[in-house]
Amino acid sequence: MRKLYLFLLLTVSWVAQAQVIRGTVVDDASNDPIPGAIVSIQGSPIQAPTDFDGNFELRGMVPGLYNVSVSFIGYEGKTQFEVQVTQAKAAVVNFRLREALQVLDEVVISTQQQFKQEAQSPVSVQSIGINEIQRNPGGNQDISKVIQSLPGVASGVAFRNDLIIRGGGPNENRFFLDGIEIPAINHFATQGASGGPVGMINVNFIRDVDFYTSAFAAQRGNSLSSIMEINLKDGRTDKTGGIFQIGASEVGLTLDGPLSKKTTYLASIRRSYLQFLFKAIGLPFLPTYNDYQFKVKHNFNRNNQLTILSLGAYDVSVLNTDQNETPEQRYILNYLPEYDQWNYSIGAKYTHFGPGGITNIVLSRFMLNNESYKFENNNRDLDQLLNYASQEIENKFRLEHQVKKSRWESMVGFGLEQAKYNTQTFDKRLPGGFILDYETDAIYYKANAFANWVGRFADDRLKVSLGLRTDIVDFNESTRNPLNQLSPRVALSYNLTENWTLDGNYGRYYQLPPYTALGYVGTDGDNSDLTFIQAEHFVAGTTQYWPWNAKTSIEGFYKRYSNYPFLLRDSISLATVGGDFGVIGNQLATATSDGRAYGLELTYQQKLYKGLFGIAAITLV
């Protein structure tokens, strides 16, 4: 989709910020500033030291893309790729450096250090920056469509954002914004899955994305195929700026700036006018979507931070019954219901950097309201064929404590959740004259605990990660037993040379079936015997890092599924549905479906080097 961008800068003195990169360099474990670190432009003589507070400023660049590196004796160096310098505002780059195992007289940043690699997830992770997202062909400024182009990722149909990872199902993915879970990231979301036709997240807010297709950290649960960690920018600290955007299908406004000396914000609203376009070209359905997003970050001091963010949407689709001339139009009008759906996620994360480690406290709430209805011949005076109303509410608390040392690091924590699900369902459109007519009002209480340890050996050539997690839900006897959901995770990474690694991972992961399945109560029975779905992952691979800011990796994977709900009315596994609109899982099911997926991935990723960048991948599943 081609878009026309109109920029409304809400300041008058923006020229003074032209061609500047500024930011801070801090210790990853303590958040203390690192004075005297050298920040430089890769391939350029431009450099600057950090001051006593860890701040730096680089000047003298013309607008364009730059790689920014930082080095300091006693710490591992880092590089931030593709930092965009413009005349509109200063580019902001912040670095967190980890203490090095070996203290050398001179710091040399290896190509491997330039790429993000975590010891607990040495395989099956792709990290992409904002410029890679914005320039993605066909991505349309939509993070899910960009992710669909990564290794191991497939999509269902072209007009939807479903993520099918390494042969899994579209309902096996989890999403986090700055560490806060966001269950819905798409408009017109499929209840019981995660896909939809249009993304909700404003990509102008994104700093970078880490996408895991295996090797999940122990603090991440309830996922079988992928974890998407979306890291957001902070608002501007100097003045307020904004972008007013008119596209082919929507209009939006984005603002960011300071609320006070210690508080910044990002905020956006968006509304589509697809209904006018669809009506003009004669389509029999008229969708409209609206969304908002904001983030507020407050720094009490260097050791205490609070982040509050929210994302929400309101989506409506009505029928255009005047467009009924062709057989195709009449067919769509005959089966397509009308939709009314809204959802929001809101969360707060408090971070404390202390002498004993880093503590995160996360509170969040999610609510989905989903309604759809259908009348015979689309006439409200005739019989009602479908009347569906449902709500999902999740209230979550998570506490995690992390200790980082040069030779090892650890994390422990736990989570508590309350989930509410209610529905009033009437549907007489089903095959064989079956009528679905039931009500559910359920509350589920959940808890989880997790621990992870990472050790570095043989002068940092060998990294070992050991993790364990368990989840419980008060649904039935099986889900209440924590031993039934023990989730061990093991990862190994060994440097054969400075820039060549051998990596492997094993993990057992659990995910609760959707509330639509847990809460089903029909004349044919209920789903009280369902339990957690299990998936075991085996991954092995090797990565070669090249001096021209590139890496080549090859990975083999094997996934084994068990206890997947088998939908009795449709005679199909729940894993194979979810790539369409509406609701999935609201029928009688048994936890008897098993499966497997295996394949091979070959990836070449080129970060910015002499104007060249890109990614190429081959996936065999």
What are these regions (language model features)?
Residues 161, 224-226, 240, 246-253, ...:
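Hydrophobic, lipid-facing positions within transmembrane beta-strands of outer-membrane proteins
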Residues 457-458, 584-621:
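Gram-negative outer-membrane beta-barrel transporters
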Residues 174, 208-219, 225-233, 240-284, ...:
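Predominantly transmembrane beta-strands of Gram-negative outer membrane beta-barrel pores used
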Residues 297-315, 336-479, 488, 546, ...:
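Face-selective signature of the C-terminal outer-membrane beta-barrel domain
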Residues 185-186, 192, 322-325, 369, ...:
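Surface-exposed extracellular loop regions of Gram-negative outer-membrane beta-barrel proteins
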